[in-house]
Amino acid sequence: MAVTNEEIKTASKIVRRVSNVEAFDKSGSVFKGYQIWTDISPTIENDPNIMFVKCVVQQGSKKEKLTVVQIDPPGTGTPYDIDPTHAWNCNSQVDPMSFGDIGLLNHTNIPCVLDFLKHRYLKNQIYTTAVPLIVAINPYKDLGNTTNEWIRRYRDTADHTKLPPHVFTCAREALSNLHGVNKSQTIIVSGESGAGKTEATKQIMRYFASSKSGNMDLRIQTAIMAANPVLEAFGNAKTIRNNNSSRFGRFMQLVISHEGGIRYGSVVAFLLEKSRIITQDDNERSYHIFYQFLKGANSTMKSKFGLKGVTEYKLLNPNSTEVSGVDDVKDFEEVIESLKNMELSESDIEVIFSIVAGILTLGNVRLIEKQEAGLSDAAAIMDEDMGVFNKACELMYLDPELIKREILIKVTVAGGTKIEGRWNKNDAEVLKSSLCKAMYEKLFLWIIRHLNSRIEPEGGFKTFMGMLDIFGFEVFKNNSLEQLFINITNEMLQKNFVDIVFERESKLYKDEGISTAELKYTSNKEVINVLCEKGKSVLSYLEDQCLAPGGTDEKFVSSCATNLKENNKFTPAKVASNKNFIIQHTIGPIQYCAESFLLKNKDVLRGDLVEVIKDSPNPIVQQLFEGQVIEKGKIAKGSLIGSQFLNQLTSLMNLINSTEPHFIRCIKPNENKKPLEWCEPKILIQLHALSILEALVLRQLGYSYRRTFEEFLYQYKFVDIAAAEDSSVENQNKCVNILKLSGLSESMYKIGKSMVFLKQEGAKILTKIQREKLVEWENCVSVIEAAILKHKYKQKVNKNIPSLLRVQAHIRKKMVAQ
């Protein structure tokens, strides 16, 4: 899949063209062999994957015009002229493999960053640091760098900062802050679909699960780790861009032991893509579990559930049933084992797959139009499919007569009197599809609720390790409401990152009286407003049309075009503008097709159908809609899918904002899912969208470590314990004394009104000093500990001496008597 012209244009707009090359000495002559990057070259014109080439500036060049010869990739050797605004300084004589921190480069302009990442990627070094971020590039192959041995290496080494960057680095630092400062942490893993987010999350979970001691109760940890294959089976699917794409968002809260190992946890799932249950695009699959179940079920299951071949179910795309390199049968065995490890009984597991089979079977039921009740298109179930319908209801533990009535019979109330009519075929199809989607979604959420009931701490979470694994920006040929929600989520996450790393930095420095250069950053506030602002945004106009009599997809787009015409983040599409519109997202323009927007946004299962499900004789089915308020009649404002989505997203962001965040940015190097293939325009767009370039600016300007005086003293009291424990001195002065006594250069730190600010290198030095002090005291502590134990033992013995003497006297008396 080649890079598109639109992507090339988007990437080109990101490049900042300024004339600041340092090729000339004081006399105006060119430094011998001076190298630069340029975006002017026949090579670039012929290969869209390349954006910059390396050249040597030739003698005779002027500041107004540079004469260059291309050397990387090798050119023709013919000199040519370029404008200095198309030239960037180059990092000469730098070995990208000798260090993993982009911030240590002399020049961090765009071509230098791309070149640094490329060299490391081509040598299988996929992790790089851009403080406060870890950049992870998908290798599309197993590098063998996430084994248990690697986990022990990063977990047990005295100074992990000397090791190459890794997701384990992020995990260790987050754990250190969780236990060292006693403050909740969140690791946010983000990136485009197919960038490797799910894999990164799994490896971090494995790191947290590793324990230095074997004294832990592994029951809860086993259940948490077992949930991964189950959640992937029910929540992931093959898309055109990713063979294992997460089609839901997941936030986990974990309690991790000081010795390692997961003690408690909780999972929140949101935004499951329900439309995939009913239909999939070409070359895409529905959720993995359908294929795993149909291929991996044993003969008893197949007979009990009446299973057919994968291509015989209308809910599954018959043209895409296989995934290269994926063994659905083997994966099904793992899912069954994982469900057992989640403490689900054999009967529970049977109910789960009975419901899955029922959903697939209901999808095969055909509805027809019939002349009835004054309607020419009244809905009816095809006679030969009644057996299929009854079987589907039986598998889902639902009363077939009641379900049939809810799908076919329309009940209206006029003047307190119920009037029965018939749904037309289209309406009945919507109800049938809604039932399939609701049963699947609620089953998925029930599995998660069951898991949480086994793994959550009784008293709730005081401090926790948060893990956010969420789909990245999506741009398909046809982008619908699901993609809009996904992309809104990513814009919110982007804003969250900007708020945390840039706006908060500037405000914090100002509030604390710390002087530093002004931080400049890219804000996506305008995009958020055009998408979500109350009363005047895409989602608000969508809700208006859903609630208005006679609302249509076309009227929704027209309303947006009329009311948002002054906003440059929204533009009508050039083709089919009555249903298509374009949003200028952080990653570039994305066109949406509003076909079925209203239908999808109103996709709330009717209250009468919910009541039928809750009356099921099966306790698990009864619990599927547990806690859900049944609403009848007209749809209320705020109950639509879009409103529910925004409320859940707001709650998630509030929870994340209450923690200390860590960021892993996953990069997809190409669209072909091939190892060692590098597409610069695509990568640059991601570097920009994920704020990696801005993070490098922050690195040069700010203080990456900051703690309140109390937190600083808690963390670094052993640097000089006398200074830390001096009760006659205020906490602020205690911090100053510790810093001065440590010998740390004043350029490494600032003292604010309530906080200590340290540059990253300063924090490393303090940690090293404290570690050395603790090593010095280790022998002394051992001696004192032994003395205390001896004293306690002596006290215990002395306490028992009178009793022992009485026993001794009694024994002697007996012996004399004999």
Swiss-Prot record:
- Keyword field contains Nucleotide-binding: yes
CDD domains referenced in this protein's UniProt entry, alphabetically = MYSc_Myo14 (cd14876)
Q: Which biological process annotations from GO are given for this protein?
A: actin filament organization
Tell me the residue numbers annotated for binding ATP.
191-198
Q: How does it assemble?
A: Component of the glideosome complex composed of GAP50, GAP45, MTIP and MyoA; the complex is formed during the late schizont stage and in merozoites. MyoA, MTIP and GAP45 probably form an initial complex in the cytoplasm which is then recruited to the outer face of the inner membrane complex via the interaction with GAP50. Interacts with ACT1.
- Cellular localisation: Cell membrane
What Pfam families does the annotation carry? Answer: Myosin_head
Q: Name one GO cellular component term.
A: membrane
Which segments carry the region annotation Tail? Answer: 773-818
Protein role:
Myosins are actin-based motor molecules with ATPase activity. Unconventional myosins serve in intracellular movements. Their highly divergent tails are presumed to bind to membranous compartments, which would be moved relative to actin filaments.
Which cysteines link up through disulfide bonds?
none
Q: Please identify the protein, giving its name as recorded.
A: Myosin-A
Key words of the record? Actin-binding, ATP-binding, Cell membrane, Membrane, Motor protein, Myosin, Nucleotide-binding, Phosphoprotein
Species classification: Eukaryota, Sar, Alveolata, Apicomplexa, Aconoidasida
Q: Where is this region: Actin-binding?
A: 661-671
